[in-house]
């Protein structure tokens, strides 16, 4: 197996809330910070993408335009990154977004992210891709490709891939394996 030099960690917003299903579980976030510290101490760059599901599930709300719902979701990821980066006090951190957020974050650029990694910082990527209709799962893949990450690590509040949302559909089918062609055919 290739030696890892850079990884991007994806935390679902729901995973941050633990059993509460909203807000934050501080003990859990502290544990995540200690796990990330072990990775950083091995000389591996760590980027973090966090979802917004502990605050906003826009796709489940028919009372708002999808674009606006996704924009609210992007802002939820910014809130989660600000909170979590503060909890990661054992590191120097920075938060990058694909859109301006005043003084709370910095605007994403590949060069800026690489400079932060060179300084040993844990870099948080908030706001997804900055465009509606794309999940933070898309954002993590985009950032991983842009930044030549060796791996994407997922920490989500779900145990696999399903044909529909198992929280909404109790009869959702879990896939043990899922060939890419099957995904393409189902689209």
Question: At which residue positions do the language-model features occur?
Answer:
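Ligand-binding beta-strand-loop-alpha-helix segment within the catalytic cores
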Residues: 61-123, 138
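Loop/turn-to-beta-strand initiation segments
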Residues: 43-47, 120-123
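Short beta-strand segments
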Residues: 8-12, 50-51, 96, 125-127, ...
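Polyanion-binding loop/helix "lid" in catalytic or ligand-binding cores
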Residues: 28, 32-35, 128-131, 172-187
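Short, charge-patterned binding micro-sites
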Residues: 50-66
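Short, active-site-adjacent cap segments at secondary-structure transitions
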Residues: 15-17, 53-58, 102-103, 131-132, ...
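Internal active-site segments that recognize and position negatively charged phosphoryl groups
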Residues: 89, 111-163
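N-terminal glycine-/serine-/threonine-rich phosphate-binding loop
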Residues: 1-46
